[in-house]
Amino acid sequence: MKRELALEFARVTEAAALAAYKWVGRGKKEAADQAGVDAMRTMLNRLAIDGEIVIGEGEIDEAPMLYIGEKVGQIYNEEEKDSVTYVDPVDIAVDPVEGTRMTAQGQPNAITVLAVGKKGSFLKAPDMYMEKLIVGPEAKGKIDLSKPLEDNIHAVAKALNKELKDLMIVVLDKPRHKELIKDLQAMGIKVYALPDGDVAGSILTCMIDSDVDMLYGVGGAPEGVISAAVIRALGGDMQARLKLRSEVKGASLENDKISKFEKLRCEEQGLKVGEILKLEDLAKDDEIIFSATGITGGDLLEGVKRKGNIARTQTLVVRGLSKTIRYINSIHNLDFKDEKITHLVK
């Protein structure tokens, strides 16, 4: 995979962020998601890649999606395919708007993300729930999801040479985590309760200017695979296991029906619900490019700032082979954007 593609993928997430930004604070999360999807798809189809979406989103919440199995790249673009001379075959994991609710409500930490790897790089996880335990490089090799969470916390604290009162753990602020958050706080641990967006929370475990030491909890499997890609690129560690909807949301006719479908999907892909997945199972190669652009400002990235038709974005790009982290600050004149996305971002 040509390293020059890193900048091209940054342009993809920038476009998605600019498009989603138009819906910040308007209370319409589906519209924000659709805008991000449309911009991301348009930009991916301008690149010299033979890409396949292997991680998308939309089956759980019926959101607009770049669907799993969708082909993207210039060779699938009727207007440009005849001019293509070389393409990189790649698998792509996307979350066009991570934090649709936060975008709709004008809240911080909404981002747009994608991870790209060679064919076969990513676990093709069904769109279901996933339990995740994530740490940064200094605690790599110290986590084991088969052991109680408390044992893992003590192991990480020892690796980081910290007391429990100095640890900070990211947990999604969801009803399912209410008791978990209370238990962690009772141990003296600082809990950073994010309303949504565990990809951003995952990355914070690996950043040198972050106070976050660990992420734990249940979130989406698609986001889990994207997190694994960037965590591997950053040198951190992760373990996970797939969870049925009925395990997470409780038994009901609807949840049980969905859980049966999830089991079937797992069987079709050779996966077992509840089996521990290590980082290497989720992201199988170091040749990964990850890009994220802020929509609303947050702990990881600044959000889009716009004055008239001039906009500013901040993008994080990570290249797995070199472990290089880049922040790209861009100023966009929306009057001169690619004509294919002008109506989406302007």
Residue ranges and their predicted role:
Residues 1-93, 158, 199, 285-286, ...:
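N-terminal subdomain of lithium-sensitive/metallo-dependent phosphomonoesterases centered on the IMPase/IPPase/PAP
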Residues 5, 204-346:
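Oxyanion/phosphate-interacting regions
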Residues 53-57, 92-94, 103-105, 124-125, ...:
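General beta-strand structural signal in soluble alpha/beta enzymes
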Residues 65-67, 104-107, 126-128, 179-185, ...:
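Short acidic, glycine/serine/threonine-rich loops at helix termini
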Residues 87-98, 102-121:
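DPxDG-like acidic metal-binding loop motif
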Residues 115-193, 286, 298-300, 313-343:
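Acidic beta-strand-loop-alpha-helix segment within the catalytic core
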Residues 184-193, 198-204, 208-215:
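Glycine-rich ThDP/TPP pyrophosphate-binding loop and its adjacent helix/strand module
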